[in-house]
């Protein structure tokens, strides 16, 4: 209500000023301009109005706070009224709480010795806890059975004399040397001699086979007809497989291999007696046959005996 009254007063003052101005406009004079008393009164009225407005605002804020507080108290009263508990139960709960507090209370004594990690003295190292494995080995350790030493000399049927000599020397040295009585030595040292000899024999057999192969490869193979040692392919001849060179083998297969034929690369080639052309070989054979026939005819002619006539 007070705020409404203030607004009405302000509106009245504005109306008065407007009407006064209109009237003074009619009766306008210099004296009215120089009269400042009315303006001072108007300023005082405005200051008073502003102070009243500030006071009313403060009162409105305080009223709102009181309303909020009253609402909070009313809600709290409502909740407490909804959770009403009889006095006997409250007394029993208090008795139980006091009993529990008395029974659980134990005087706490402060520790006199500080731990190592607080004092900084780390000379004494913490030993780690050894954790035992929960899974134990199911297979127990098995002891090796001791075996009797073999005194006899083992001779291989396909071995050489040097191997038997080495095995006999090894057995004599082992018999002369003192043997420990541990079964592990018997199982590991004594019975490993035989596999070693086997491996040595295998190595020697492989070496012998390799030597024979290299010997056969290094042997100088030559043609049985012309004596050639290098040829792209070895062929079969009258002496067996791979006994003739490629050229001689081809002519032997076709039936044209003659003694007068020699390839040009043959070490026994001579231009007077041999040729690598079949036609020339035939001519040479004809000439030879004619010369041989002439010689035979000359030898077969009868020798004329000269009869010496005695003169009288």
UniProtKB/Swiss-Prot annotation:
Keywords: Activator, DNA-binding, Metal-binding, Nucleus, Transcription, Transcription regulation, Zinc, Zinc-finger. Residues 1-33, 56-77, 136-186 are annotated as: Disordered. GO terms for cellular component: nucleus. Transcriptional activator that specifically binds 5'-GATA-3' or 5'-GAT-3' motifs within gene promoters. May be involved in the regulation of some light-responsive genes. PROSITE patterns: GATA_ZN_FINGER_1, GATA_ZN_FINGER_2. InterPro entries: GATA_TF, TF_GATA_pln, Znf_GATA, Znf_NHR/GATA. One of its GO terms (biological process) is response to light stimulus. Residues 142-151 have a biased composition (Basic residues). This is GATA transcription factor 6. Residues 157-186 have a biased composition (Low complexity). It comes from Arabidopsis thaliana (Mouse-ear cress).
């Amino acid at each position: 209500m007070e705020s409404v009254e203030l607004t009405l007063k302000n509106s009245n003052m504005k109306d008065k000023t407007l009407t006064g101005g209109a009237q003074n406009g009619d009766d306008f004079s210099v004296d009215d301009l120089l009269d400042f008393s009315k303006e001072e009164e108007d300023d005082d009225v405005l200051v008073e109005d502003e102070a009243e407005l500030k006071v009313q605002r403060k009162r409105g804020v305080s009223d709102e706070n009181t309303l909020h507080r009253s609402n909070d108290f009313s809600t709290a009263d409502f909740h407490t009224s909804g959770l009403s508990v009889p006095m006997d139960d409250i007394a029993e709960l208090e008795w139980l709480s006091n009993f529990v507090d008395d029974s659980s209370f134990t005087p706490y004594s402060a520790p006199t010795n500080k731990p190592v990690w607080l004092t900084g003295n780390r000379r004494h190292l913490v030993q780690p806890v050894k954790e035992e494995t929960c899974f134990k080995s199911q297979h127990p350790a098995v002891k090796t059975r001791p075996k009797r030493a073999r005194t006899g000399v083992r001779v291989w049927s396909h071995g050489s004399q040097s191997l038997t000599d080495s095995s006999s020397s090894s057995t004599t040295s082992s018999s002369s040397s003192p043997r420990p009585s541990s079964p592990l030595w018997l199982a590991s040292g004594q019975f490993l001699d035989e596999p070693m000899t086997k491996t040595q024999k295998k190595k020697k057999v492989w070496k012998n086979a390799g030597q024979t192969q290299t010997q056969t490869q290094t042997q100088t193979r030559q043609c049985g007809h012309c004596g050639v040692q290098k040829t792209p392919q070895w062929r079969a001849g009258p002496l067996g497989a791979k006994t003739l060179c490629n050229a001689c083998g081809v002519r032997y297969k076709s039936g044209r291999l003659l003694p007068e034929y020699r390839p040009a690369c043959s070490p026994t080639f001579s231009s007077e007696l041999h040729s690598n052309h079949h036609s020339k070989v035939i001519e040479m054979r004809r000439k030879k046959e004619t010369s041989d026939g002439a010689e035979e005819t000359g030898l077969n002619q009868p020798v004329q005996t000269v009869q010496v006539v005695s003169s009288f």
